[in-house]
C-alpha cells in the first residue's frame, strides 16, 4: 500500500528539515560505516578514532557533528554507537529544559555509552554549565538546597561519549565547542552519491529504479539524502498508481513535475520568490520585508527556508540595499535581464 500524498505549505518536499513521515523507513538507513555513502574523509577519520577507542576499551572522545539539515548526523551518531558496541541514548537541546533533566540522563548511562544531543546549540545556558564537568571530568557538580544551607555534591559518572549535532556551529559557546575532541563537518552530497542512495533505497522499498530514474530524483534533491528519500517515496506513489514495476526516468520526471519540483530542485515557492524579485521588482535590490509582503509569506520563512538554497545556487545575492537577482535567476526563468543603467526597481529603498 502506498503512502497518501499530503503536503501542507509548511511541509515542502524539498525542505531539508525533518518532517512527519521522514522516519518511517528506518530500514533504509545505513547501519555501519561501510554502508554509509558519501562524506568519505569524515567517515575515514571516524573509523580510525572508533577502532582505536575500541581496541583500548575506552570511551570515544566527544564528537561534534555539524552541517546543514538532512545530511545524516543522527544516522552517523547511531553508527558510532553500533561500531563501538555500546548503548545509544538520544535527546535534543530544546527538550532538556533544566539541569536536573540532563543530570537524570547522565546518571543512567553505562560505561562508554553514546549520548546523542541533537540541536545542541539550543541548550539552555544553565544546562551547558552542568555539561562542562561531565564532559571533561566525568562528574556532576550539583547544588543541593538553597541559601545558607546549600551544599555542593559531586557525583561520579562512567566514561561516556557525547555526540552533539548542530546546523549552526557558530552559535555554540566556545567552552562547549572546545570540549569536543572530534569535530566533524558534513558537506552536501554530489549527484552520483545521491543516485546510489536512491537506487539502494528503491530496491529496499521493493520497486527498483533505473540508473536514469535514480539520477532524475538525485539531481532534484538539493544535495541532501533526506530530500532524496522524501522525493523517492512520492515518486514511488506515482509509479504504483501507473502500475509501473520500476522507477524510470520518464516516471520520475512526470511525478516530480506534478509535484512542482523542477530540474534543479526548485519548488513553487522558490520560483514565486524569483518571479517576484525579477518581474515585480526588476531584479532588485529590494528589501526582504517587501518581498515577504508581495509573497504573503513571513520574513523568517524567506530568510531561513527559501533564501539559503537560492544563495548557495547563485540565484540571488544579499546586499546592504536588499536582494538582487543574478543572471542565473533570469536565465532559469527564461527571462531577459534589464540592461545596466536602467532605473532602480520600485521597492529597492525599503529596509532589509
Curated annotation (Swiss-Prot):
Single GO term (MF): four-way junction helicase activity
Protein name, per record: Holliday junction branch migration complex subunit RuvB
UniProt binding sites for DNA: 299, 318, 323
Keyword Calcium part of the UniProt annotation: no
NCBIfam families in the cross-refs: PRK00080.1 (NF000868), ruvB (TIGR00635)
Chain positions recorded as ATP binding sites: 28-29, 70, 73-75, 136-138, 179, 189, 226
Underlying gene: ruvB
Biased composition (Basic and acidic residues): 9-25
Catalytic activity: ATP + H2O = ADP + phosphate + H(+)
Subcellular location: Cytoplasm
Function: The RuvA-RuvB-RuvC complex processes Holliday junction (HJ) DNA during genetic recombination and DNA repair, while the RuvA-RuvB complex plays an important role in the rescue of blocked DNA replication forks via replication fork reversal (RFR). RuvA specifically binds to HJ cruciform DNA, conferring on it an open structure. The RuvB hexamer acts as an ATP-dependent pump, pulling dsDNA into and through the RuvAB complex. RuvB forms 2 homohexamers on either side of HJ DNA bound by 1 or 2 RuvA tetramers; 4 subunits per hexamer contact DNA at a time.
Region Head domain (RuvB-H): start-end pairs: 263-352
Entry note about domains: Has 3 domains, the large (RuvB-L) and small ATPase (RuvB-S) domains and the C-terminal head (RuvB-H) domain. The head domain binds DNA, while the ATPase domains jointly bind ATP, ADP or are empty depending on the state of the subunit in the translocation cycle. During a single DNA translocation step the structure of each domain remains the same, but their relative positions change.
Quaternary assembly: Homohexamer. Forms an RuvA(8)-RuvB(12)-Holliday junction (HJ) complex. HJ DNA is sandwiched between 2 RuvA tetramers; dsDNA enters through RuvA and exits via RuvB. An RuvB hexamer assembles on each DNA strand where it exits the tetramer. Each RuvB hexamer is contacted by two RuvA subunits (via domain III) on 2 adjacent RuvB subunits; this complex drives branch migration. In the full resolvosome a probable DNA-RuvA(4)-RuvB(12)-RuvC(2) complex forms which resolves the HJ.
Binding, Mg(2+): 74
Region annotated Small ATPAse domain (RuvB-S), chain positions: 190-260
Keywords of the record: ATP-binding, Cytoplasm, DNA damage, DNA recombination, DNA repair, DNA-binding, Hydrolase, Nucleotide-binding
Region named Disordered: 1-25
Pfam families the record matches: AAA_lid_4 (PF17864), RuvB_C (PF05491), RuvB_N (PF05496)
Gene source species: Maricaulis maris (strain MCS10) (Caulobacter maris)
Amino acid at each position: 500500500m502506498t503512502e497518501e500524498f499530503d503536503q501542507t505549505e509548511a511541509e515542502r518536499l524539498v525542505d531539508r528539515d525533518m518532517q512527519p513521515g521522514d522516519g518511517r523507513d528506518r530500514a533504509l538507513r545505513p547501519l555501519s560505516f561501510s554502508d554509509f555513502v558519501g562524506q568519505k574523509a569524515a567517515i575515514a577519520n571516524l573509523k580510525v578514532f572508533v577502532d582505536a577507542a575500541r581496541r583500548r576499551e575506552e570511551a570515544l572522545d566527544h564528537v561534534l557533528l555539524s552541517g546543514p539539515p538532512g545530511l545524516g548526523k543522527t544516522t552517523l551518531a547511531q553508527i558510532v554507537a553500533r561500531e563501538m558496541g555500546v548503548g545509544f541514548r538520544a535527546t535534543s537541546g530544546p527538550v532538556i529544559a533544566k539541569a536536573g533533566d540532563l543530570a537524570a540522563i547522565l546518571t543512567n548511562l553505562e560505561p562508554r555509552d553514546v549520548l546523542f544531543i541533537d540541536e545542541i546549540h539550543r541548550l539552555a545556558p544553565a544546562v551547558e554549565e552542568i555539561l562542562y564537568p561531565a564532559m571533561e571530568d566525568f562528574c556532576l557538580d550539583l547544588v543541593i538546597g538553597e541559601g545558607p544551607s546549600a551544599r555542593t555534591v559531586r557525583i561520579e559518572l562512567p566514561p561516556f561519549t557525547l555526540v552533539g549535532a548542530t546546523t549552526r556551529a557558530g552559535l555554540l559557546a566556545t567552552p562547549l565547542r572546545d570540549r569536543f575532541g572530534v569535530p566533524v563537518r558534513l558537506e552536501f552530497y554530489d549527484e552520483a552519491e545521491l543516485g546510489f542512495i536512491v537506487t539502494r533505497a528503491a530496491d529496499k522499498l521493493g520497486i527498483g529504479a533505473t540508473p536514469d530514474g535514480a539520477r532524475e530524483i538525485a539531481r532534484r534533491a538539493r544535495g541532501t539524502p533526506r530530500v532524496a528519500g522524501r522525493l523517492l517515496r512520492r515518486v514511488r506513489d506515482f509509479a504504483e498508481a501507473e502500475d509501473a514495476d520500476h522507477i524510470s526516468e520518464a516516471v520520475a520526471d512526470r511525478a516530480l513535475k506534478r509535484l512542482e519540483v523542477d530540474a534543479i530542485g526548485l519548488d513553487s515557492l522558490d520560483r514565486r520568490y524569483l518571479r517576484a524579485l525579477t518581474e515585480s521588482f526588476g531584479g532588485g535590490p529590494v528589501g526582504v520585508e517587501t518581498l515577504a509582503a508581495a509573497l504573503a509569506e513571513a520574513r523568517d520563512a524567506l530568510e531561513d527556508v527559501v533564501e539559503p538554497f537560492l544563495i548557495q545556487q547563485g540565484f540571488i545575492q544579499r546586499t546592504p540595499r536588499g536582494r538582487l537577482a543574478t543572471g542565473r535567476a533570469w536565465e532559469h526563468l527564461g527571462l531577459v535581464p534589464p540592461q545596466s543603467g536602467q532605473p532602480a526597481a520600485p521597492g529597492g529603498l525599503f529596509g532589509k
